[in-house]
């Protein structure tokens, strides 16, 4: 049994210290997801705390056959979607249909060594972050879970309550929407999946 599995089992048995270890282990990816969804550091901090509280309250119902990270990040994404809807963020039209696009969606590498290149990439990351804020809450969750957290289309469908075909359509539309928003200022950077533990944009 892995160390994480031990913490989960102990937390399910009422060990608060074990749950604290889980919080320490996942606080960065949870915060990053909240920040990419909500766009504000203070809101992301509040949402992170709420997500962990909800996980704590429901830990006894967690199925250990399922990856803990997937379960925790799904709770986080759902809370962020609810929070965005309560804020009544502006929504973009989802009427345009399109076929699925398997081309890679590449994000600039935050660990670039060349200083000038790193500066350009930080600017591109800021543009991507700004573009994400223009998406529908569910589309934003789908694209962030897919390309930052490497969720499969099936996992996204299960966690967001969508069909796989709906997930594919939303990802396609979201990619086009992000590219369209980025092109207002500069050529769209190629987007690729990044580890969920990478620094928030």
Which stretches of residues belong to each language-model region?
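Acidic, proline/glycine-rich intrinsically disordered inter-domain spacer in sigma factors
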Residues: 2, 101-130
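Short, charged helix-capping/linker segments at alpha-helix termini
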Residues: 12-21, 31-50, 164, 187-188
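Helix-turn-helix DNA-binding module
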Residues: 126-141, 145-166, 180
